[in-house]
């Protein structure tokens, strides 16, 4: 029998009988740690799961960066993310291609923000501490802070140049200055930093960027330097032009200044179509008793001028057209079926009937109006109701007359129609038998008469 103690962890004793005979014992047992598999009153694991194992989330590291000569190598990934990426923007040809070559003298100090993708709860304090230590160690105290946090989201600093999804952008040719304080008048206008032509859709989101400056993380508020807005890369993979995402605000605390629906609105076209069901025409075929529903759909192109306001997320409205399936009730008379198309009712004919039973059908005036008009439908229904009422009255009077001619049911006013039909059939059969007997008796009497006439003739001749 294999031992219950795991080979990899000899100090742990198996308490679960289900895992007792397993050849490979797990490292964590359901009954060992109440943090994972606790009772119904236990709380689910939260952010302190990393404190329990003394681990930190390890995001994918950016490419290796070239650091200034006086600055030491980064000790961890958090410090490396905060350092400028100099090898990306070392080529002057690339700077001239993006129009950023003359932006180096606008502001004297670029400070790179943390990676907006990895600004979680557990890494935020480590990033703060790394920035403060970096600034105090090589670049001076961070106490003197600038007083322009509003343009920090949409503005860029002197070397503020970013490419693609890299959150660390910008560099300086010389060493960083020791004094980080800047007057509010030297804050850079976003229009000066980004001279690229932008469309109407993206320019609408630029004024909203300064108002969302408090949404940045604690790293920005502790250092208090102008933030850098990354320029969207041309080869982003979404198929949009390079200037479609130039003025998007950067939020490093996980709170996006633009909602998720903005990205969905960017993918929608300016010219959309609205489909409305205009006319519904219903026809009923009397031959096959099936409802035929015709939907007339008109398509109107809607050109919406997208100004400062956002487009609604569901402008493309498509009303679903569901065909109406109606089951014909064969027991009830259809109002669409005319009385001429209905099968003729069988009339009970009796030889003793005093008058012929007829169903008076007035000639139907044929109208040239369409079949779907309200006047035609109402007139047809009215004529059908009149004819149906007259037919029922004639049928009732026929049963009453037949009942009066049957001797057994003359005084029975509550006789059912089935009883009337049965008694009338028996009475007709009895009358036919009596008629046959009377015919035989008549033939005998005629033969007797012929014999008597012959005798009388013979007596005269003698």
From Swiss-Prot:
InterPro entries assigned: bHLH_dom (IPR011598), HLH_DNA-bd_sf (IPR036638), Myc_transcription_factors (IPR050433), Tscrpt_reg_Myc (IPR002418), Tscrpt_reg_Myc_N (IPR012682)
Annotated stretches, region: Disordered: 133-177, 232-290, 332-390
Domain bHLH: 379-431
Region entry Leucine-zipper, spans: 431-452
Coiled-coil residue windows: none
Comp. bias regions, Low complexity: 138-174
GO CC annotations, alphabetized: nucleus
Keywords: DNA-binding, Nucleus, Phosphoprotein, Proto-oncogene
Region span, Interaction with AURKA and FBXW7: 61-90
Annotated region described as Interaction with AURKA, given as residue ranges: 19-47
Main location, first listed in the record: nucleus
PTM-bearing positions, type Phosphoserine: 259, 261
Motif range (9aaTAD): 76-85
GO BP term, pick one: astrocyte differentiation
Disulfide bond positions: none
GO molecular function: DNA-binding transcription activator activity, RNA polymerase II-specific; DNA-binding transcription factor activity, RNA polymerase II-specific; kinase binding; protein dimerization activity; RNA polymerase II cis-regulatory region sequence-specific DNA binding; sequence-specific double-stranded DNA binding
Post-translational modification comment from the UniProt entry: Phosphorylated by GSK3-beta which may promote its degradation. Phosphorylated by AURKA.
Compositional bias annotation for Acidic residues: 257-276
PANTHER family: MYC PROTO-ONCOGENE (PTHR45851)
Entry function: Positively regulates the transcription of MYCNOS in neuroblastoma cells.
Subunit relationships: Efficient DNA binding requires dimerization with another bHLH protein. Binds DNA as a heterodimer with MAX. Interacts with KDM5A, KDM5B and HUWE1. Interacts with MYCNOS. Interacts with AURKA; interaction is phospho-independent and triggers AURKA activation; AURKA competes with FBXW7 for binding to unphosphorylated MYCN but not for binding to unphosphorylated MYCN. Interacts with FBXW7; FBXW7 competes with AURKA for binding to unphosphorylated MYCN but not for binding to phosphorylated MYCN.
Protein name: N-myc proto-oncogene protein
């Amino acid at each position: 029998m294999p031992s219950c103690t795991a080979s990899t962890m000899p100090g742990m004793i198996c308490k679960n009988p289900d895992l007792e005979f397993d050849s490979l014992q797990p490292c964590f047992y359901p009954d060992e740690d109440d943090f994972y598999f606790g009772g119904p009153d236990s709380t689910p694991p939260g952010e302190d799961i990393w404190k329990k194992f003394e681990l930190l989330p390890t995001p994918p590291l950016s490419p290796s960066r070239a650091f200034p000569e006086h600055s030491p190598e980064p000790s961890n990934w958090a410090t490396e993310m905060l350092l400028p990426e100099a090898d990306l923007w070392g080529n002057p040809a690339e700077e001239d291609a993006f129009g950023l070559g003359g932006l180096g003298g606008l502001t004297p100090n670029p400070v790179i923000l943390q990676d907006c993708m990895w600004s979680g709860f557990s890494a935020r304090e480590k990033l703060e501490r790394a920035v403060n230590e970096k600034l105090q160690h090589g670049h001076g105290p961070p106490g003197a802070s600038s007083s322009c946090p509003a343009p920090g989201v949409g503005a860029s600093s002197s070397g503020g140049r970013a490419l693609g999804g890299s959150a660390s952008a910008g560099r300086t040719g010389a060493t960083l200055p020791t004094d980080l304080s800047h007057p509010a008048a030297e804050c850079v206008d976003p229009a000066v930093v980004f001279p690229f032509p932008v469309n109407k859709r993206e320019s609408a989101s630029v004024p909203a960027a300064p108002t969302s400056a408090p949404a940045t993380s604690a790293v920005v508020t502790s250092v208090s330097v102008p933030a850098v807005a990354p320029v969207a890369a041309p080869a982003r993979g979404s198929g949009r032009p390079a200037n479609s995402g130039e003025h998007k605000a950067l939020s490093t605390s996980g709170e996006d200044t633009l909602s998720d629906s903005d990205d969905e609105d960017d993918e929608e076209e300016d010219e959309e179509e609205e489909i409305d069901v205009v006319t519904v025409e219903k026809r009923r075929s009397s031959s096959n008793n099936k409802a035929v529903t015709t939907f007339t759909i008109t398509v109107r192109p809607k050109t919406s001028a997208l100004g400062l306001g956002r487009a609604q997320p569901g402008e493309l409205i498509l009303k679903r057209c569901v065909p109406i399936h109606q089951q014909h009730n064969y027991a009830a008379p259809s109002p669409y079926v005319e009385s001429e198309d209905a099968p003729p009712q069988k009339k009970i004919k009796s030889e003793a009937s005093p008058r012929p039973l007829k169903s008076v059908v007035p000639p139907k005036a044929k109208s040239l109006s369409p079949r779907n008009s309200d006047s035609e439908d109402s007139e047809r229904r009215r004529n059908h109701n009149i004819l149906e009422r007259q037919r029922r009255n004639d049928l009732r009077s026929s049963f009453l007359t037949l009942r009066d001619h049957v001797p057994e049911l003359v005084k029975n006013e509550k006789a059912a129609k089935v009883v009337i039909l049965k008694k009338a059939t028996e009475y007709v059969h009895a009358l036919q038998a009596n008629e046959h007997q009377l015919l035989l008796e008549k033939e005998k009497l005629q033969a007797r008469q012929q014999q008597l006439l012959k005798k009388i003739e013979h007596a005269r001749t003698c």
